Structures are given as structure tokens and as C-alpha cells.
Amino acid sequence: MHKIVLASSSPYRRALLEKLRIPFEFHAPDIDETPHAGEEAAPMVQRLAIAKAQALAERYPRHLIIGADQCCVLDGQIAGKPLTEANAIAQLTSAHGKAVTFYTGLALLNSASGALQACTEPFVVRFRALEDAEIAGYVHLEQPLQCAGSFQCEGLGIALFEALEGRDPNTLIGLPLLALADMLRREGVNPLRR
């Protein structure tokens, strides 16, 4: 069986990958995540997912390396991690009553053969009309300062939404497991067979 490495320091991505019950290591890649001038969301997250996987290929030369990246698009603009409470409140205020699209790029690199699989999975979140006090209360309670879109859907953030639309709800948390399981099976790793 191939050894697997998750190219991420995200505890959320690690928790998602653990759902597949396959042993893996994780290591944070060191890459420049700056968007290119004029780059759109879907190509950007796919490029960064591939770059994260490729960044670990030399360190893990006989592994399947998983890279992932995510961003959210609000009003046609890429919205990054808020980093401060004020920015999180501003993002959620802009999002209330609107649809926000998340793009998650996924890459699986076989570092021994060089075979690369990559895709981008969209996921749409429809926000309820929110009151200012709800937004401020949510940000204070959950502190989603490291989360694209300023929320955690796996926690209290679910109360912000009217609807969720997408193929795989894991995509919204940062790792599309349906697509990843398909990629792993193509590399001979089936989570249902040991």
C-alpha cells in the first residue's frame, strides 16, 4: 500500500482525511500562496493545491501526496481569511442574504511515478438575512479568524445559513472526500479494502 502524506497543517483537513481510515502523515508545505494578477478563484485554488503537493515531493519521494486549497468568492471578489474580528464582521455583513461560492482545489501526486490528478470542487452557501447582533455574537463566540468566509460550518456557523448546495459537504470544510476517494482508488488505495 502507498504511504500517504497530507500537505497541510490544517487540523480540519486532517480530521476530514481521518474519516477515510487510511494511515497518513502530514507536513505543512512552504509555498507562496499569493494570487497571480487577474487570477480567478477556481484556477488559483487548483494551482495552489498542486503546488502544495509538489512542494513535498522531494521530501516524500515514494508517497501519494494530497494538496488542497480553498477560497471563497463574495460579490465577485476572492475573500481571504479575516484574521481580525473586525474583518470577520465585515465579511459576514457583506455576505448576509447572499450566495457565496467556495472553491476547493484538490491534487493527488504520486511522487514515485509523477502521476498527478487534480480538480476543483465548488460549493455554494446561501446566507440568511442576518442581524448585526447575530453577526457580532457569532464572531465573538466562534472566533473564525483563520477561516475563509469567516465561519465554521462544522460548528455554530451552520446557524448563519439558509441553504448549502454542492456535491460533497466535506468540500466546504476544505477537503473534498468524494473526489479524493476516487483519486486514491485510481492509485490503488481503496479505503474500503485493506
From Swiss-Prot:
Active site, per annotation: 69
Site (Important for substrate specificity): 12, 70, 154
Broadest EC class assigned to this enzyme: hydrolase
GO cellular component, one term: cytoplasm
Principal subcellular localization: cytoplasm
Short name of any one Pfam family annotated for the protein: Maf
Protein's name according to its UniProt entry: 7-methyl-GTP pyrophosphatase
GO BP terms, alphabetized: nucleotide metabolic process
InterPro entries in the cross-refs: ITPase-like_fam (IPR029001), Maf-like (IPR003697)
Natural source organism: Sodalis glossinidius (strain morsitans)
